[in-house]
Amino acid sequence: FRPGNMQHDDALSAALARCGIPYSSCVGLAVFDSQDARYRLHSGVHRRHGVLEMPVLTFQDWQLGGRRHLKTLTIAGTSFDETRLLLERAHEQGIPLVVLLTHPFEYVQRRDDSMRTARGNALHQDRLARLCRYLDGNRDRFLPTGMGEAGDAVQAALRAAPDERNVLLHGSGWRSVRRLAEQAVYDRYGSWALARQGAPA
């Protein structure tokens, strides 16, 4: 189960338990923070009211002085280089599960929700394709799967060796800067291309 916009609280977990829903992925701290310390989850798997919560990975992408910036792992908002680095660091630290968030609409650029004027988002499509190739080439360390299958596998592993660590992974500041620049340039180009596409002949 995943709620819209990652909106969650303790009452939601209790309701999921009453409904017999065994797995949830409700937490993505950089998207929504309920301010409940019990749900300030960055990674891993955690039981709440008997429901196995598998938060979308939240990581620190940069820090300036005492100010740190948190980001939730998505295709649209994270470069392939950043994602690969996070997967490597998660593997090094034995984090049992990494959840990445994406949506179909992120792979097209559009002028409005009518989709009358749209084009493929080559930047996001390339990130996904590169991630898929990377995961396919590293199946000895990473097993791409859906939430239900992941929940079953993690549930069995936790019975053998309970692990509720909540590790905050650190990304790379310079990779974040490069991603921000890349995204800004591509978004501007996409807006220009859409304007040309929608212009009257």
Residues of each region from the PLM?
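Residue-level detector of family-conserved "landmark" positions at structurally sensitive sites
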Residues: 1, 26, 145-147
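A generic secondary-structure micro-motif detector
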Residues: 2-3, 121
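Active-site-adjacent pocket scaffolds in enzyme catalytic domains
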Residues: 3-95
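C-terminal domain-boundary segment and adjacent tail
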Residues: 77-200
